[in-house]
Amino acid sequence: MSEGLRLVVYDRTQRFRAPRALGYSWQYGTHLYRALGRVDRAYGARDFGGALRFLATHAPEQPIRELQFWGHGKWGKIFVDRDALDRSVLAPSHRYYDLFRSFQQRLTPDALLWFRTCETLGARSGQDFARALADATGARVAGHTYVIGFFQSGLHCLRPGENPSWSATEGLSRGTAEAPERAHWSTADSPNTITCLDGRIPDGF
C-alpha cells in the first residue's frame, strides 16, 4: 500500500435522532481507530457537501489512500441523514460532481473506498454502484450486502475493470436482485463477516 492519508467520514447527524447510541458509537469509534493507528483523521458530516469538501481540502499536500464511510445505506446508495449519494454523482450535472472530482483526483493508484453501511453493495443496484465507482475512480471499492451492526457481513471488494464475484441476491431476505425489499441482519456465520472492531479487509474478500 502506498503512502497517503487514511480517513473516516461518518454521519454526525445520527447523534440527534434515534437511535442516538449508534451516532455516538460512530463518533467514539473514530477515536478508537485513531488511537489504534488505523486512521489519520475523522470528520463528522452533516451532508455530503460538507463531507466531500473535507475530502477535497483536508491536508491538500497529501494524497488519500483510504476512505471509510460510516453511516446508513441502501442498495447502491449511502446516506448522511436524508442526503443520499449514488452513482449519479459521476455525472457532470450532479450537484456534488465538482467536489467529488476534486476528491477523486487525490486518490492514490491503490486507494480503498470502504462503505461500512447496510446493504450498499447488495442487489443489482449495489453491484452497479461498485462497478461504476471503481471504474471511475480507479480505486478498490468495498462494502456490504447485509444489514450491519457489531457483525458486518457480506463484505466484498471490487477493483476497476472487474465484475462482481458475489451473487446479486446475497443478503436479501425479501424481493429480487432487481427489486430488493429487505436484507438479512449480519451474523457471525454469514458470508464474509467481520466485526466493527476489525480495521482491515481479510484477504479473499
Predicted features by range, described:
Residues 1, 67, 203-205:
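Non-Sec secretion/translocation targeting segments of pathogen effectors
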Residues 1-54:
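A domain-level signal for caspase-like cysteine endopeptidase catalytic cores
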Residues 28-36, 55-59, 103-104, 133, ...:
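Hydrophobic, Leu/Ile/Phe/Ala-enriched alpha-helical segments that form helix-helix packing faces
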Residues 30-38, 63-66, 112-114:
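Solvent-exposed, well-ordered amphipathic alpha-helical segments
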Residues 50-65:
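Short amphipathic alpha-helices and their capping/turn segments at secondary-structure boundaries
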Residues 66-70, 75-153:
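Catalytic cores of nucleophile-dependent amide-cleaving enzymes
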Residues 113-205:
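Active-site-proximal C-terminal subdomain of hydrolase catalytic domains
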